Amino acid sequence: MKQKFSILLFLLLLWFTGSQAVAQNAPNPFDIEQPSLRVFLPAPELATGRAVVACPGGGYSHLAVDHEGYDWAPYFNKQGIALIVLKYRMPNGDRTLPISDAEAAMKIVRDSADVWNLNPRDIGIMGSSAGGHLASTIATHAKPELRPDFQILFYPVITMDKSYTHMGSHNSLLGKDASAELEKEYSNEKQVTKETPRAFIVYSDDDKAVPPANGVNYYLALNKNGVPAVLHIYPSGGHGWGIREGFLYKDEMLNELTSWLRSFKVPRKDAVRVACIGNSITYGARIKNRDRDSYPSVLSRM
């Protein structure tokens, strides 16, 4: 890998108090009590301005940071894409911890766009297994300024429905006695809107840990809402293969991902956003779902 920069940022994420994340001394690399970002930038001559924030899996109890995180850097950097790997905190009874870490990561990457030569309107999120649940949660729940522009999901946990979720992830995030309302809130196939970003979703048909029905239902919800999405289910491979050589369909998967990443246009980095100032019609008074369908809301997404 022609890696020009590898920057290790350690974050104090007091997200809900509005505190600014700052660099800290390096903790133990296996410490998941303190979140961190590791940034891999492509060579300047290859850089496209695109970036991906990676959320490794681990059932919300540990993190597979290598084959679902750092080991992806050569692939993305070769495509001219920056890779930012997030080591997020485990919930340990507080589901807001990993979610706030991922939201803060999106904010930091966008705020650092000029420094890292990124397009702030071309920042995606990637997640594997439970990290896929975290990534799809940010894609479906986050405020517009924190929402990714696209999502890449490998064998993701999508639902919290006990009939087909990954129970380890469910219990670590929500607890064994989670209410039906809470399970619905974090069943991301039920939270898709027209504003949810486009998605690339991959499973193996013989995945016994996370049933592919998680991704099928998410794809159907995206499709119903007019969100571009692709779903690939390979005949075998089980669960947790990441970018390991042992995955039989690795080459096909990478070719599909490369083609997908090249398939959609990106707003220019210097594109101007236009705001409307006007009467109640312009603002969207009496328009159902005005946060989504009013003129200012529509223009903000252009």
List the predicted regions and their residue ranges:
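Conserved alpha/beta-hydrolase "acid-adjacent" motif
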Residues: 208-214
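C-terminal catalytic histidine-bearing segment of alpha/beta-hydrolase fold enzymes
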Residues: 40, 216-268, 282
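Mobile cap/lid helix-loop segments that gate and shape the active-site cleft of serine hydrolases
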Residues: 26-29, 156-191, 197
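Short beta-strand element of the alpha/beta-hydrolase
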Residues: 48-57
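Serine-esterase "nucleophile elbow" of acetyl-processing enzymes
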Residues: 266-302
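Short beta-strand/loop motif that positions the catalytic acidic residue
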Residues: 195, 200-203, 207
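Primarily recognizes the serine-hydrolase "nucleophile elbow" in alpha/beta-hydrolase
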Residues: 104-169, 183
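Catalytic nucleophile-loop/oxyanion-hole region of alpha/beta-hydrolase
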Residues: 64-73, 84-120, 244-252
